Amino acid sequence: MASSYFLFLCLLLCGGPELCNSQTLWLLPGGTPTPVGSSSPVKVECLEAELVVTVSRDLFGTGKLVQPGDLTLGSEGCQPRVSVDTDVVRFNAQLHECSSRVQMTKDALVYSTFLLHDPRPVSGLSILRTNRVEVPIECRYPRQGNVSSHPIQPTWVPFRATVSSEEKLAFSLRLMEENWNTEKSAPTFHLGEVAHLQAEVQTGSHLPLQLFVDHCVATPSPLPDPNSSPYHFIVDFHGCLVDGLSESFSAFQVPRPRPETLQFTVDVFHFANSSRNTLYITCHLKVAPANQIPDKLNKACSFNKTSQSWLPVEGDADICDCCSHGNCSNSSSSQFQIHGPRQWSKLVSRNRRHVTDEADVTVGPLIFLGKANDQTVEGWTASAQTSVALGLGLATVAFLTLAAIVLAVTRKCHSSSYLVSLPQ
């Protein structure tokens, strides 16, 4: 009976039985709720030279098993190699396979790919009962120390090999926290937030160098995917942050913390015609001698909306004049803008000098959780508040009615007692 009263009160106050469940829920990619305490449906094992991904066919925790053929790894669509049993699917892939991307940070080598569940209609039907899901996967290996089973024997590098060793530079592009002090712990964003990006080069024993972001492009899938469309330029024309020309306030940070580091912010966005909730940013990074004066080919320029002009991080202001009309040079980025992302690798390899002072680096995926002030959420909140107010009002009326009845019964009892005592 108590549970019935609780259910009645819950329905009265909350407006529906689905809100009466006290168990906390969280959302898997694709919007399917799963209890917090449940085991993870995707498990990753990072080995010395390969990764093993084990996927439960009950991917959404609903008891409905997904089809193994609907599961692939990476943009190459690597198929599962081993099926453990009827309820589990396993992928075995080398670290460099399945379109895996490698990124070098200060302390680690990061190999990243993604698990894709792309359901297809079965039995000639045109309906789907599960969602499309993209699960980011990362394997991190410490740069300091030995990850192999055999110890490395240190050796002296001959002098004639030292020059070539010193020419190797390590470029990186990382998502940072708002204070720029630490790397962002999770690549998740709401629309309306700002992404803090830090490009960096580790020079080692090289002569002092200054880093520049030549051009950056954003795509819903990793480059060089030939199907990367649509795309959006963030930086173009040898260092012009063109994304700041739109309604955003994207800009380079002034001053830069170190010559070998360049920081910039980008107002988060997503592609209107893309069903994916992910974003990849690929930047072409390059270096120049630290004592070289910035010019049209080596610059970092942001658009200032107040003055309606381009301003450099360092150097004379006139080096940014070409950003307004895009004729800084006949650069590979200009050709890239004409042909699109599918020509990225071909154009870069054809126009780039055959040296190690520039590189293409990708950060991602950036995962969108929806708008920070989503109208649907606001509408649900308003509806819930209305239901609660209505419920409280009805509960108050019921309480007052019950109190009136109790008071009336009490008075009647007192009156009856008085009448019975009169004959005495």
Curated annotation (Swiss-Prot):
Disulfides per UniProt: 46-139, 78-98, 216-283, 240-301
Effect on the protein of changing residue 111 to L/V: Strongly reduces protein solubility
Signal peptide bounds: 1-22
Residue positions the entry lists as glycosylated: 32, 34, 39, 146, 155, 162, 273, 304, 327, 330
Gene Ontology BP terms: binding of sperm to zona pellucida; blastocyst formation; egg coat formation; humoral immune response mediated by circulating immunoglobulin; negative regulation of DNA-templated transcription; oocyte development; positive regulation of acrosomal vesicle exocytosis; positive regulation of acrosome reaction
GO molecular function, one term: carbohydrate binding
Maturation and modification: Proteolytically cleaved before the transmembrane segment to yield the secreted ectodomain incorporated in the zona pellucida.
Gene3D superfamilies, per database record: Zona pellucida, ZP-C domain (2.60.40.4100), Zona pellucida, ZP-N domain (2.60.40.3210)
Tissue spec. comment: Expressed in oocytes.
Positions on the Extracellular side per record topology: 23-387
Entry GO terms, CC: collagen-containing extracellular matrix; egg coat; extracellular space; plasma membrane
Residues that span the membrane, as ranges: 388-408
Keyword presence, Signal: yes
Cellular compartment(s): Cell membrane
Taxonomy, superkingdom: Eukaryota
Domain ZP: 45-308
The record's note on its domains: The ZP domain is involved in the polymerization of the ZP proteins to form the zona pellucida.
Oligomer status and interactors: Polymers of ZP2 and ZP3 organized into long filaments cross-linked by ZP1 homodimers. Interacts with ZP1 and ZP2.
PANTHER family on file: ZONA PELLUCIDA SPERM-BINDING PROTEIN 3 (PTHR11576:SF2)
Family per similarity comment: Belongs to the ZP domain family. ZPC subfamily.
Chain's role: Component of the zona pellucida, an extracellular matrix surrounding oocytes which mediates sperm binding, induction of the acrosome reaction and prevents post-fertilization polyspermy. The zona pellucida is composed of 3 to 4 glycoproteins, ZP1, ZP2, ZP3, and ZP4. ZP3 is essential for sperm binding and zona matrix formation.
Protein name: Zona pellucida sperm-binding protein 3
Organism: Mus musculus (Mouse)
Name of the gene this protein is made from: Zp3
